[in-house]
Amino acid sequence: MRPRMWLLLSAQLAALHGNSVLQQTPAYIMVQTNQMVMLSCKAISSSTTRIYWLRQLHAPSSNSHHEILAFWDSSKGTIHSEGVEQKKITVFRDGSLFFLNLTRVKLEDSGTYFCMVIGSPTLIFGTGTQLSVVDILPTTAQTTKKSTPKKTVCRLPRPETRKGPLCSPITLSLLVAGILVLLVSLGVAIHLYCRQRRARLRFMKQFYK
C-alpha cells in the first residue's frame, strides 16, 4: 500500500465510520486464543470491485491508528499489506459478501475491524466489528430463580371407610339375644292377658247365673 494512500485512510477514517453502504456482522465477537474467526461485510452496491480490511487497535478517535491488513481485488484476488502474515489472514468474496478470515488468533489481534471501499470522492467504511481475544471464555452465570412459597391448604381428614362385615360376631349375638328376650316377654304378656280374660269371663258367667 502506497504511503500517500495510508495517510489518506488514517485522516478520513474517524468521520466516515458506519456508512449504510457497507454492513458488517457481527458487531461484537469474543473468541479464545488459537481459534478461527470469520468476519463479513455486505456491499449494497453490486459494482464493488475492490474492498479493504483494516484493523483499529484502540477505541475509535480522530487520533486512532489504523492498520491495513489486506484488500480483495476482482482482477488480482487477495493482496496483503507489508508485514502481514499471509497464512493467517485470508480475504475472499461470495456474491455481495466480502469475508475476512483470521486463523490462530492471539491476544494482540483484539481490536475493531473495518471493511472499506474507495468512493468518489470519499472513503466509505463499514459499521465495524469489535473482536476480543481471550485465553479463557467467561462462563455465563446462571440466574437463580426465586422460589415462590406455596400456599398451605388445610384439608379436613376424610372419614375412614371400614371394610368387611358391619357387625362383629359379639354384636350379632347380643342383637339376637335381645330379640329373643323381647319375644319371650311378649309371649308371657300375651299368656297373662289371655288368662286374665278367661278369668273375667268365668267370673261374669258365675255372676249372671
Curated annotation (Swiss-Prot):
GO terms for biological process: adaptive immune response; regulation of immune response. The keyword Secreted does not apply. GO terms for cellular component: cell surface; plasma membrane. SUPFAM superfamilies: Immunoglobulin. Phosphorylated as a consequence of T-cell activation. Pfam families: V-set. InterPro entries: CD8B, Ig-like_dom, Ig-like_dom_sf, Ig-like_fold, Ig_sub, Ig_V-set. Integral membrane glycoprotein that plays an essential role in the immune response and serves multiple functions in responses against both external and internal offenses. In T-cells, functions primarily as a coreceptor for MHC class I molecule:peptide complex. The antigens presented by class I peptides are derived from cytosolic proteins while class II derived from extracellular proteins. Interacts simultaneously with the T-cell receptor (TCR) and the MHC class I proteins presented by antigen presenting cells (APCs). In turn, recruits the Src kinase LCK to the vicinity of the TCR-CD3 complex. Forms disulfide-linked heterodimers with CD8A at the cell surface. Interacts with CD3D; this interaction couples TCR-CD3 with CD8. Interacts with LCK. This is T-cell surface glycoprotein CD8 beta chain. It comes from Saimiri sciureus (Common squirrel monkey).
